[in-house]
Amino acid sequence: MKNEIAAVVFFFTRLVRKHDKLKKEAVERFAEKLTQILQEKYKNHWYPEKPSKGQAYRCIRVNKFQRVDPDVLKACENSCILYSDLGLPKELTLWVDPCEVCCRYGEKNNAFIVASFENEDENKDEISKKVSRALDKVTSDYHSGSSSSDEDTSKEVDVKPSSVAATPSPVYQISELIFPPLPMWHPLPRKKPGMYRGSGHQTHYPPPVPFAYPNPGRKNKPFRPIPVTWVPPPGMHCDRNHWINPHMLAPH
């Protein structure tokens, strides 16, 4: 694990020195803090027998969705330097796996091997040479780390909100635009058995209440049906609360 972390640290220090914004002491301090942070993070997530396991956890990534890598930012804070002074590309991905470290500039470019190891006996000079050769080759191919759509180095890391607030548009429901409001329904009271029914005579029921639409100017008031007075047919008279048809009583 120490060789792979050393390759990552050499990779970052090479990019920082190329940006030429920090002094040598600040770069060395950043490299020391980054080494400590990565060792602490990877010690329980390192699987030489299965290098792909935990790959996402060990990945160092910067893109338009994550403009600052948390581990690199923590190393900057611990070494008292600004993240923007590193001069990192806006789109950068590093996969730190057992025996191999790979990198990709830009989200649409191909990945390349930063350094690969067959054993743990390699010294720092050999690791530094591997990283330098890989960087020299890739910078000529990818134009010094330019991304697929952005500039090659990040100028700012603070995400600033837009100064123009969007004016909220009125919200309408489809039901309000298509269907008019329905009238409130008042059910008729339940009648006792036998009401409106005579003994041995024709059964009469109360007339239906005509349906009407409510006044559109009174949307919030309950709708009350218009009362209708029932007029009996000609020839019928009431006898003790019963309507009697004299034709039915006539002998046949």
From Swiss-Prot:
Cystine pairs: none
SUPFAM superfamilies membership: BTG domain-like
Job description of the protein: Overexpression impairs serum-induced cell cycle progression from the G0/G1 to S phase.
Gene3D superfamilies on file: Anti-proliferative protein, N-terminal domain (3.90.640.90)
InterPro entries hit by this protein: Anti_prolifrtn, BTG, BTG-like_sf
Alphabetized SMART domains for the sequence: btg1 (SM00099)
Originating gene: Btg3
Tissue specificity remark: Ubiquitous.
Similarity annotation: Belongs to the BTG family.
PANTHER family: B-CELL TRANSLOCATION GENE, PROTEIN BTG3
Name of the molecule in the record: Protein BTG3
CC terms in the record's Gene Ontology section: cytoplasm
Positions of the UniProt region annotated as Disordered: 138-163
Alphabetical GO biological process terms: negative regulation of mitotic cell cycle
